[in-house]
């Protein structure tokens, strides 16, 4: 995040120093502007003591980047996160004139991430960024150890939203199959014009397991 608050590329400086060149600026000459916050999206399960959660990413969509947010990742839809290497999926960076603006930009971007197929710490990151002690900048390296399991889970709103989206998809897919499997009758209101499991005098039940 240093490049956001200084406008300088310190990695480039390291390469110059390794080639025997002097540092371009002294510490006193480096000026800071604004704030920047970085998080790392990992294929880990925070609710299980951050155990690695390798697997195949079945769906992945990154948010659109802008001047206040950037996502760095080499992972694409369909990639496999191996248990043999570091399970980092991406880095997210938010920046702005104030700490609050930087955090808000990062929260917005993380909320737009769509990832299915593997366990990850997205919910934990969102909970951390929304926590008042973090927003106020009064946390230390022992802060995570002080949290409970409930602080590591996805926000309930995201869980409900995911279930609603899945249910809507299943219903829509079922309607499509029913429409294309129905008998070609002239009466669109006839129960025989649909193939949805309707039975005379019986309740229609459908059980769907969402994973």
Model-flagged regions — what are they?
Residues 2-211:
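Catalytic cores of soluble metabolic enzymes centered on carboxylation/carboxyl-transfer
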